[in-house]
Amino acid sequence: MNGDSAGNPMAGGSSAGDVDRISDLPDDLLHLILSYVSDDAAEVTRTSVLSRRWRRVWIHAQKLCFGDDRQSRWRRLANFGGFVDWAFAQRGDADIQSVIIFMSRLDSATPEQVNEWLRYAVRRVVKTFWFNACDSTLIGAWWAPPPRDHGHQLPTVELPSHGRTASINLNLSSYPFRLKLPASPAARYEALTDLSLSSAWFREDEAVAGRRTLADFISSCCPRLRKLEIIDPMRLPQLVLRAEALEELIVASTRDTQTMDVTAPNLRIFELHYFNSMTSVTSYGESIDLVVRITAPRLEEIAINNSTLEIEDNLDLRIHGLASVRRLKNLTLAMHGHNCCNTDYGLWLLNNCPNVEHIDLRLRYEMLATHEVDDLTDNRAPRLYKARSMVIDACGLDQYLVTSVWSLLLMCPDLISLRICLRGWG
């Protein structure tokens, strides 16, 4: 194959032959045919062998997925990083709607190549850019201890100062990449509405002159950000957000984060998952108290889930303006019959969300001290008269299940839908 396919690491030796009827088709029809081709970038570029004109048609594909694990077991992509470089170079300055890069091996690309891809993406990708460095080894597992710097310079993924992409997803869980945010005062991501950052090293526990924090980047550079997802952040001791447009905030596996302070007047959904620091960077195996302060007068849905939570773990939850909340999800209640632990965040939310309509909770049996319980059957216990549906996930309650469910029904006298999921019952 010759022409524009030269230099393609994926180029084969076959040709289109003497008969080339495809080249006589109009551009609109060629683009329509291309839209039905797999979004796998390797497959898309291989269409260049079909005809003379098709050698350039693939460049107009609006969604490309690059993956170093997408090759068959009989043939592996020898130069993944070079192939991505070549494909972007062939496209030039043409815009594209979506780019996904999945890198499963450390030797698939250099940090310099990764940063060049990021610079290309935020300039040319209009809708979605997703970079996923997700290894299949145990180092990427959530239960594994986090990688440590040991004084060595970690490779850096640097976000450019300006971007026009609407949705950016950076999953750096495979390798210890440090995320560097743009320090320029003029940095702007005007079009960014969705941002997801997973397993990034922020190193905000160290004072560095001129470095921009995650909170400052979001507040100053992303005026239209509506959804923020932060998963397993490392070296991020505090997250102080002031975000006018933010509507959805999801935080998971906070490791060594000790303070979250969020003021978001348009926030509708707040989710917090696996928040105890069982894999803390600085004290692996030890829990660190987490203080969560949320000011969001329009908050409608709260989901707080931690299947590993113990009574001694300390979540200091301070959410202002709970009258607007209509949905509580993934709550944990520590119960013994009709008695419920009164030091738990789950009961605190039930007591302080009088207008909640849907409740999704997990029951857990605990032997509770007398001074730590509230009797849910007591006439002075709160009543949620607007609650209409409830989902209960029960495990290990045995003979206390019926009493516990009965007490919850008393708390929600106008309930019209109840679903109970029993786990571990033979």
Regions found by a protein language model. Name each.
Residues 54, 305, 312, 317-319, ...:
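C-terminal amphipathic alpha-helical segment
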Residues 2-245, 252-254, ...:
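Leucine-rich repeat
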Residues 3, 381, 411-426:
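C-terminal closing repeat unit and adjoining cap/tail of repeat-based domains
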Residues 64-67, 99-102, 127-132, 166-171, ...:
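Conserved hydrophobic beta-strand positions in leucine-rich repeat
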Residues 119-120, 142-162, 182-190, 207-223, ...:
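A structural signal for leucine-rich repeat
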Residues 121-127, 354-357, 410-417:
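Structural alpha-beta junctions
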